[in-house]
Structures are given as structure tokens and as C-alpha cells.
Amino acid sequence: MQARDPHANVFFVGLMGAGKTTVGRAVARRLDRTFFDSDHEIEARTGARIPVIFEMEGEAGFRDRETQVITDLTQRENIVLATGGGAVLRPENRDCLKNNGIVVYLRANPHDLWLRTRKDKNRPLLQTEDPKGRLEALYEVRDPLYRECADFVIETGRPSVNGLVNMVLMQLELAGVIAKPLQA
């Protein structure tokens, strides 16, 4: 992997519940960068929660808003961005992420994701009779897309949030994005 701009943006991709927001926020704090979550940004811009947007506009309307937010945010510098789990479904989003920063895929198996998200009613795609099966289906479709745009993959299985943050920082150091991992 070639050395990159030391001020490069860092973008997190992965399925819902993988830890993109939690880990992303901690990485941003350690790098002294501004953190954004694309879903939170959509909610701030519309004044509506994600389930309401899905209900009113459908998934296609939500994805249009998501593409606009990703396009806008990836033009900034020195940011850390946690994307929504489905952001990679659109080729233009994958290209935008790949071309404007370092992409980190936080990978978790569907069973672990189900354990983390099973009580969360703010995830419209999981409001089904078989949310675990839904996560497995989403994983099958999205895993190759996450891998396509990722500069590296971090397995989220057992490590603590701090452990995951340190793994991300180590990869950023190896990629030439930071001089050395910063201490907590």
C-alpha cells in the first residue's frame, strides 16, 4: 500500500452494528479530527429519524439522501466518517469513498451483528420476522462491496473498542496516514 496524505480522511464501512460510529468517533478523537456519521447527518439535515425517512420516501429516497451526504462530506479534509451499512450499494458512493480517503471495513459475522442490534428499533431493515436471516442476506450482498472499496479490513469479533481503535491506528500508520499510533 502506498503512503498517503497524512491528512487523509478516514471512512468506515460495514454492516449495521459493526461499530463504525463507536470506533470512528474514538479514532477521530485520537487523531484530533472532526467526526461525522452519515446517518446522523441525514437526520440533522432532514429533521427526521431514519425510520421515518424510510417510511415516507422508501429505501430509494433514503439512498438518494445518503449519496448526497457522502458526496458532501467526502469533499472535506481531516475528517473521520462512519457511513451507513448500505452506503456501498451504490457504485458512486464506493468511488467517492475510495477516491477521497482511507476506507476501513469493520467486519463482523452476522450472528454477532444480530446480538448487537436485536433490540434496536431504529434500524428499518431489521424490522422483520427474521432479523438474523436478514443480516445474513445483507452480509452476502454487501461483504464483497465493502471489500471492493476497503483499504483494509478489521475483524471486530472479540477486541474491545480501544483494541479496535489501536488496530485501526496501526493500519493507518502502516499506510503512511499517521506518523505513529497516538496514545489514548
Swiss-Prot record:
Pfam families in the cross-refs: SKI
InterPro entries according to UniProt: P-loop_NTPase, Shikimate/glucono_kinase, Shikimate_kinase/TSH1, Shikimate_kinase_CS
Pathway given in the UniProt record: Metabolic intermediate biosynthesis; chorismate biosynthesis; chorismate from D-erythrose 4-phosphate and phosphoenolpyruvate: step 5/7
Single GO BP term: amino acid biosynthetic process
Cofactor note: Binds 1 Mg(2+) ion per subunit.
EC number annotated for this UniProt entry: 2.7.1.71
Residues bound to substrate: 39, 63, 85, 142
Predominant subcellular localization, coarse grouping: cytoplasm
Domain of life the protein comes from: Bacteria
Binding locations of Mg(2+): 21
Keyword terms, alphabetized: Amino-acid biosynthesis, Aromatic amino acid biosynthesis, ATP-binding, Cytoplasm, Kinase, Magnesium, Metal-binding, Nucleotide-binding, Transferase
Localization, UniProt: Cytoplasm
Cofactor(s) needed by this chain: Mg(2+)
General function of this protein: Catalyzes the specific phosphorylation of the 3-hydroxyl group of shikimic acid using ATP as a cosubstrate.
Subunit-level organization: Monomer.
UniProt name for this protein: Shikimate kinase
Originating species: Burkholderia lata (strain ATCC 17760 / DSM 23089 / LMG 22485 / NCIMB 9086 / R18194 / 383)
Recorded name of the encoding gene: aroK
